[in-house]
Regions:
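Short, solvent-exposed loop/turn segments at secondary-structure junctions
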Residues: 97-100
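Active-site neighborhood of phospho(di)ester-bond hydrolases with catalytic His/Asp-centered motifs
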Residues: 89-92, 118-131, 142-145
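A solvent-exposed, acidic/Ser-Thr-rich amphipathic alpha-helical stretch
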Residues: 104
Length: 180
């Protein structure tokens, strides 16, 4: 699908000025992903078992996560960004935090990785149409409201970025945020 959408790969990053935008693929490891008979199927099974052990409430068939390979790529990329003094925004389909019925299967591992780097300024996600917001070790994590269930109301946000400020201007039922 990503090729049909002219995306460079399943997960990727791009740089604009002193900002790096990282697009995670939280649909990579999922019940609906084409992973049967591959090493990713083992990762799926491992994630499900770990979630059951911690009594996580997000081990549902509509959620997904990222592979160990993608996690290693993310860690290497963040390390480079930190070293170069760049600022980073993270984007994913599934919420990373706070935990909900719609969270990424390995969201805890992802936010632990993000929190190691001061270059990460915020993370944005969707999937949970009600929206959500939380801080994880000083990183704002924003789940943007959806518009699927709101036929007569729109929801989108415009993000304005400057050297020392991040402004999320919610429209319709979308929330607004401001971060320094």
């Amino acid at each position: 699908l990503y090729k049909q959408l002219s995306m460079p790969s399943e997960y990727y990053s791009f740089k604009k000025g002193d900002w790096v935008f990282i697009m995670l693929n939280t649909n990579e490891i999922a019940s609906y992903a084409n992973i049967a008979g591959t090493p990713k199927e083992n990762e799926w099974n491992r994630m499900q078992e770990q979630i059951k052990q911690i009594k996580g409430k997000y081990a549902y068939e509509w959620n997904g996560g990222i592979s160990e390979k993608q996690m290693q790529w993310l860690d290497r990329l963040l390390k480079k960004c930190e070293k170069k003094g760049l600022s980073v925004l993270i984007f994913s389909h599934h919420p990373l935090y706070p935990q909900s019925d719609f969270s990424a299967l390995n969201g805890n591992e992802i936010v632990d990785t993000l929190s190691k780097y001061s270059c990460v300024k915020a993370a944005f996600s969707g999937h949970h149409h009600a929206g959500a917001f939380g801080y994880y070790k000083n990183i704002p994590l924003i789940t943007l409201e959806g518009m699927v269930e709101t036929e007569n109301q729109n929801a989108y946000a415009i993000v304005e970025i400057s050297q020392d400020h991040l402004l999320v201007k919610g429209q319709g039922r979308a929330s607004s945020y401001s971060f320094k």
